[in-house]
Every structure is written in structure tokens, then in C-alpha cells.
């Protein structure tokens, strides 16, 4: 009977510990260990790739990204480092203009929706987040903070991918 009590006590002690392991969700939805290969019309993510370019982007409560225009070459693997210098939560979502507009509309309906793709990063106030993305096609692509009200206030930018 002692063995049964020890197992029960161990399970009671481990359950709260396990729940604390995921405790404070920092909303960094960048390079997820479980993310596999993802390909889109604006590029791809592969967990095996290594950055060839690093770009720092500052996010602010005046609803701006700095820089708001980024130039890269087709094939570049970019590590984005996002610094939220404001007091509000901000996010960085890459996409086409249409995909960003669609996602912004979805966010109005469900502002707490999950962001689990490697082209999306939530960054808490005063924090830094990262994500890595390869631009496989030349063209003009977009990014924005799709938290309701931010995108509409002008928190958006452009990625120009040259060949």
C-alpha cells in the first residue's frame, strides 16, 4: 500500500509542475521546434535552414514598423529580430496583401486566435521575438500587425524581393 501512496503523491506533485512548464505564454510564434516545412506564394520556412541575412525591425505604439520597407534578394534566408519598444502587444505577420487583409478581418472576429505559423510572431511590450523566412520568389510582399486597430492605423510594411 505504501507504493500506491508514493505513486499518488508523485502524480499530485508532478501535475502542477507540468502545468507550470508552459505557464507564461510569451506569444513568440516564430521558429517553432515542431514546425515542419511550410511553403507559400511569398516564401518558405524549413526548420533546417540557416539565416543568410539578419534584419532588425522595431515596433512602436505609434503604429509603425521601422524600417517599413525592406529589400532582400530572391533566395535570401532572413532572420527577423522584432523589438517591441511600446507598451502594447504587437505582431509581425508576413504575407500577400490579400492574405493580410483576410487575416486582419479574421482577427476582428477572433482577436485571440492562434498564431502558430513561422511567418507570424507576437511580441509582448518590451520584449524581442524572432522568426526566419526564405523569400523564394521575387516580387513585392507585405507585413503587418494584425491586432485589431493596429493594421488599420497604418502598422504595415513592404518587403521588396529582387531577383
Where are the regions that the model predicts?
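N-terminal signal peptide c-region/cleavage motif recognized by signal peptidases
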Residues: 16-18
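Short aromatic-acidic-glycine turn motif
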Residues: 98-109
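Bacterial N-terminal signal peptides that target proteins for export
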Residues: 1-8
